[in-house]
């Protein structure tokens, strides 16, 4: 790895799926997955259909088309049930919980954002020169309608005013197109899709080594799949011998710390507290835990160790973009943390609901597609031996992905359903001719 660069980003493009793994100091730090058959809603603009306006809950509920959404508060003028409302999706729907949305959305640019439902100008504090700020304000007064708000980012500090004007006019044209789409009716419908994984995470590339690959080969080289599987386990043994038990539930996550196997727990309590703070924060971020998180730190004669653990994990959280909030000790002696839920956890991304080990059928199906591409070379008539569930997934919601695999192979792929195979078992063989 190049000197001074501790972050390594692996990008894998496979049929039906894009995966990104972020390694820090050689260790898996984060995973992002985008599946073509299940596009993300977060960040999209949707013309939703108002289902209910609940004044007693101060909330508005919408049909987003395939998902429900809830808006905290009631916009003015108050929406009519059955009517249309344009909203931006702030968080993905999870299980029975709808997506969180807002009516105060923005159209994002590189140097500026416009807010169609708000008014007024705002210029980044990083743009400090009075002359520059005055020139930008004059430009805004000439270009931006009075009923639209705008925020000028720090990226506009050194650009030519003509470049900024061009971007502002492009954003306004985009908004006009959306309004025409809205007027045409037909809600619920997506007016502006969410940014792709690569667009959304453009900041990844800063101070990082980028490696790109296809069909899972790069992930195998760096043992990423095994590291993901490890992060899905509820029991983790750290390098120091401490055992962490991480129990994820719908409303909260409980983390238990077992020091029984740690020989120097009492001789070096402060050092141990620092090590555990780093490891537990790493696990929380990698697993994408959210909601209420309770940590049971063992009581000891040295109470300073618990306080040191508290201050260390708070320090680490304050320096990380994950935005974990460390509250303090509860009356029962548990350390309470919270994190807003904006998307699925690692378990939600890979495992079946209420299962500790069974992978989603879509995960197995996409892995089968990768295997067909990498291991069918030289087989004239490949046959996928699998469960009925896997076959149904490839011929159903993942049909486009399966068709892409056949196109790349240049041959038809036959199925053989083996009733004795488990949900996640499959293998490839040459089709037997009679």
Task: Give each language-model segment a name.
Residues 147-152, 188-189, 206-210, 291-292, ...:
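Hydrophobic beta-strand segments of well-ordered beta-sheets in folded domains
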Residues 2, 7-11, 16-24, 31-32, ...:
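S1/OB-fold single-stranded RNA-binding interface
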Residues 1-39, 44, 94, 102-146, ...:
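Extended, charged alpha/beta regions that create polyanion-binding interfaces
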Residues 30-31, 69-72, 120-123, 254-255, ...:
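Short small-residue beta-strand/loop micro-motif enriched in glycine and branched aliphatics
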Residues 52, 59, 84, 149, ...:
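Residues at the N-termini of beta-strands
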Residues 77-81, 116, 153-156, 257-259, ...:
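Short loop/turn segments at strand-loop or loop-helix junctions that form parts
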Residues 149-155, 334-337:
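A generic structural motif
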Residues 58-64, 93-115, 171, 240-419, ...:
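Conserved glycine-centered short motifs in functionally critical loops
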């Amino acid at each position: 790895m190049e000197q001074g660069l501790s972050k390594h980003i692996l990008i894998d493009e496979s049929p039906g799926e894009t995966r990104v793994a972020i390694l820090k100091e050689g260790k898996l730090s984060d995973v992002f997955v985008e599946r073509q058959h299940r596009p993300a809603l977060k960040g999209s603009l949707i013309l939703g259909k108002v289902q209910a306006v609940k004044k007693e809950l101060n909330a508005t509920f919408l049909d987003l088309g395939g998902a429900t959404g809830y808006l905290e508060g009631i916009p003015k003028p108050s929406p009519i049930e059955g009517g249309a409302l344009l909203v931006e999706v702030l968080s993905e729907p999870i299980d029975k919980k709808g997506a969180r949305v807002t009516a105060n959305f923005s159209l994002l640019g590189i140097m500026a954002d416009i807010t169609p439902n708000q008014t007024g100008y705002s210029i980044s504090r990083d743009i400090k020169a009075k002359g520059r700020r005055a020139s930008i304000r004059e430009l805004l007064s000439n270009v931006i309608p009075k009923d639209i708000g705008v925020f000028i980012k720090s990226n506009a500090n050194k650009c030519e005013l003509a470049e900024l004007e061009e971007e502002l006019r492009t954003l306004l044209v985009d908004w006009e197109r959306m309004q025409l789409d809205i007027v045409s009716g037909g809600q619920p419908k997506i007016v502006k899709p969410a940014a792709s994984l690569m667009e959304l995470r453009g900041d990844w590339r800063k101070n990082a080594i980028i490696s790109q690959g296809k069909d899972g080969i790069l992930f195998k080289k760096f043992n990423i799949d095994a590291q993901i599987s490890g992060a899905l386990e509820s029991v983790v043994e750290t390098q120091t011998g401490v055992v962490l038990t991480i129990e994820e539930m719908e409303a909260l996550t409980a983390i238990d710390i077992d020091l029984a196997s740690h020989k120097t727990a009492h001789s070096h309590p402060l050092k141990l507290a620092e090590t555990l703070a780093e490891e537990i924060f790493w696990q929380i971020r990698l697993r994408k835990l959210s909601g209420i998180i309770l940590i049971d730190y063992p009581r000891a004669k040295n109470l300073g160790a618990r306080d040191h653990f508290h201050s260390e994990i708070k320090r680490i959280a304050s320096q990380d973009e994950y935005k974990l909030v460390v509250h303090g000790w509860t009356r029962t002696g548990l350390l309470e943390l919270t994190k807003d839920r904006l998307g699925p956890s690692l378990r939600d991304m890979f495992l079946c609901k209420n299962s500790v080990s069974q992978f989603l059928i879509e995960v197995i199906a996409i892995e089968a597609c990768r295997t067909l591409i990498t291991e069918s070379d030289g087989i004239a008539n490949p046959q996928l031996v699998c469960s009925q569930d896997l076959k149904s997934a490839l011929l159903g919601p993942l049909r486009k992905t399966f068709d892409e695999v056949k196109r790349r192979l240049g041959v038809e792929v036959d199925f053989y359903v083996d009733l004795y195979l488990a949900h996640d078992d499959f293998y490839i063989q040459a089709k037997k001719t009679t």
